[in-house]
C-alpha cells in the first residue's frame, strides 16, 4: 500500500466518521452484494448453438470491434481477464445458447451435462451462476412468437425449453451452493396494430403456469419473469408487458425482473423497486443504459445507476434483490465493457453504503427538505474514491484506470490473434 493511498484512506475515514459512517462496515456490506455479469457481452449474443446465425427477437448488438470470443474456452478466458480487474463478489449469467456439445442439441432437450464445463469453471472460480432460456434466434421464434404462439406444437416446444432450462438452473444452484436466478424473457409481440391483445396473453399465462408447475428447491433455483415495452419488429404490441408480469409475479410469487431499458424513456426502474417489493418476494435487476431506446449501452456511474443502488441499500434489500447487468456493446473492447460497467455498478453500491441515510430520514420525516437536499448534494463531495481505492487494494485489483493497461496487453497478446 502506498503512503498516498494510506493518507487518503485515513482522511476518508475521518470525513465519513464525521457524518456517522463507518467505512469499514461499508466495505463489509459491499462484500455482501455480488453483481451478476452477463456472458453475452463477450460475443455479441452469438452463443455456441449457431454462432453464425442472426440475432433476432427485437434486440441488436451494434459494432464490429475485433476479438470477440468464438467458443466457450475463449469466452471463459475473457471473463477471467475481466473478473481479475473487478473487486469483490461476482456471479455469471448464462443463456441457454451457450451450451457445449459435440453434436447439435435441440433447445427443448438441453440438459445439465451440456453446461457441465460452466459449472466446474464457476466452482473453480468461486462464482455463482444464473441462467436464462433463450427464446430468440431460432427458426421456431422467427414469426415473433414463442410461449404465446398460437400453434400448440410450437408453443409446447418453448414450454419444454423453459422446463429444461429450469433443470439446468437447479443443477447450477445445487452444485455451487447458491441459488441460480432463472429469468424468462420472450420477444413475443406484433409490429403493427393488434386486434386481439387478450388471446396471446391468455396463452402466455397458461404456458408460464406449465413451465413453473414443478416445484424446485428455492435454495437451488429462483424463477423470474421480465417485461419489455417494445422491440424491433414488435413496436405496437408486446405480450409480456409490465402489467402482465407484475400481475404474474404477484399472483404466482415469482421474482420480477426489472430491466432499466425495458420501459418508456421517461420511466426509471429505481422508482419501481419499492413499489414492486410490496407485492413480490424478490426482484432481479438488469442494470443497463438505454439511449432513446433499449440499446443496452455500457452502464455508467450516472444518476439512475446511483438511484438503483441507493434503493437497494436504503431499504436493506440485500437478500431480496439480485443485481444483474445487461448490455452488449460491440463497438468497443468487450472486456473493457464488462470492467467499466461492473465497476460502475459496484461504485454506485459503495456510494450508497457511504450515505448517512438515518440522518437523511430524520430530516425528511421532520419536513426539513432544505437540509435534506443540502446534505444529499454535499455528500457527493466526500472522498468516496479513497474508500473505493482501498476496496480495490484489498481485493488485489487496480484502483484507477490502471486496469486499462491490462486490457490493452490482453488485446495485443490474445484478442488480436482471433482475426
From Swiss-Prot:
Pathway: Carbohydrate degradation; L-rhamnose degradation; glycerone phosphate from L-rhamnose: step 1/3. InterPro entries: L-rhamnose_isomerase, Rhamnose_isomerase, Xyl_isomerase-like_sf. SUPFAM superfamilies: Xylose isomerase-like. One of its GO terms (molecular function) is L-rhamnose isomerase activity. It comes from the Bacteria. Its cofactor is Mn(2+). It is found in: Cytoplasm. Its main location: cytoplasm. It catalyses: L-rhamnopyranose = L-rhamnulose. GO terms for cellular component: cytoplasm. Keywords: Cytoplasm, Isomerase, Manganese, Metal-binding, Rhamnose metabolism. Its EC number is 5.3.1.14. The keyword Cell inner membrane does not apply. One of its GO terms (biological process) is L-lyxose metabolic process. Binds 1 Mn(2+) ion per subunit. Catalyzes the interconversion of L-rhamnose and L-rhamnulose. NCBIfam families: PRK01076.1, rhaA. Homotetramer. Belongs to the rhamnose isomerase family. This is L-rhamnose isomerase. It comes from Shigella boydii serotype 4 (strain Sb227). The lineage of its organism: Bacteria, Pseudomonadati, Pseudomonadota, Gammaproteobacteria, Enterobacterales.
Amino acid at each position: 500500500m502506498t503512503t498516498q493511498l494510506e493518507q487518503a484512506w485515513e482522511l476518508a475515514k475521518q470525513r465519513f466518521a464525521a457524518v456517522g459512517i463507518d467505512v469499514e462496515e461499508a466495505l463489509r456490506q459491499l462484500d455482501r452484494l455480488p453483481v451478476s455479469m452477463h456472458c453475452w457481452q463477450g460475443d455479441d449474443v452469438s452463443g455456441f448453438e449457431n454462432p453464425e446465425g442472426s440475432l433476432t427477437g427485437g434486440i441488436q448488438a451494434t459494432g464490429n470491434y475485433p476479438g470477440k470470443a468464438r467458443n466457450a474456452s475463449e469466452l471463459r478466458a475473457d471473463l477471467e481477464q475481466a473478473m481479475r480487474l473487478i473487486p469483490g463478489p461476482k456471479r455469471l449469467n448464462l443463456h441457454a445458447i451457450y451450451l457445449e456439445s459435440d453434436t447439435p442439441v435441440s433447445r427443448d432437450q438441453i440438459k445439465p451435462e451440456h453446461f457441465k464445463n460452466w459449472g466446474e469453471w464457476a466452482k473453480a472460480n468461486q462464482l455463482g451462476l444464473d441462467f436464462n432460456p433463450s427464446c430468440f434466434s431460432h427458426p421456431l421464434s422467427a414469426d415473433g412468437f414463442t410461449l404465446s404462439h398460437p400453434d400448440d406444437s410450437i408453443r409446447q416446444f418453448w414450454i419444454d425449453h423453459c422446463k429444461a432450462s429450469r433443470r439446468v438452473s437447479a443443477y447450477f444452484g445445487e452444485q455451487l451452493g447458491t441459488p441460480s436466478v432463472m429469468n424468462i424473457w420472450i420477444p413475443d409481440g406484433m409490429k403493427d396494430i393488434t386486434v386481439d391483445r387478450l388471446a396471446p396473453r391468455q396463452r402466455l399465462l397458461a404456458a408460464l403456469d406449465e413451465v413453473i408447475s414443478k416445484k424446485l428447491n428455492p435454495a437451488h433455483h429462483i424463477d423470474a419473469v421480465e417485461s419489455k415495452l417494445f422491440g424491433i419488429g414488435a413496436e405496437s404490441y408486446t405480450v409480456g408487458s409490465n402489467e402482465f408480469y407484475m400481475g404474474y409475479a404477484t399472483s404466482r410469487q415469482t421474482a420480477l425482473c426489472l430491466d432499466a431499458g425495458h420501459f418508456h424513456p421517461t420511466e426509471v426502474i429505481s422508482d419501481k423497486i419499492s413499489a414492486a417489493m410490496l407485492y413480490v418476494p424478490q426482484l432481479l435487476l438488469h442494470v443497463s443504459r438505454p439511449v432513446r431506446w433499449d440499446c443496452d449501452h455500457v452502464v455508467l456511474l450516472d444518476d439512475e445507476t446511483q438511484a438503483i443502488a441507493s434503493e437497494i441499500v436504503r431499504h436493506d434489500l440485500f437478500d431480496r434483490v439480485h443485481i444483474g447487468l445487461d448490455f452488449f456493446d460491440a463497438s468497443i473492447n468487450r472486456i473493457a465493457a464488462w470492467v467499466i460497467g461492473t465497476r460502475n455498478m459496484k461504485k454506485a453500491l459503495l456510494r450508497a453504503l457511504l450515505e448517512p441515510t438515518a440522518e437523511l430520514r430524520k430530516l425528511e420525516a421532520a419536513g426539513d427538505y432544505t437540509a435534506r437536499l443540502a446534505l444529499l448534494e454535499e455528500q457527493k463531495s466526500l472522498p468516496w474514491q479513497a474508500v473505493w481505492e482501498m476496496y480495490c487494494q484489498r481485493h488485489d485489483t487496480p484502483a484507477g484506470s490502471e486496469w486499462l493497461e491490462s486490457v490493452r496487453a490482453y488485446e495485443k497478446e490474445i484478442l488480436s490473434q482471433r482475426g
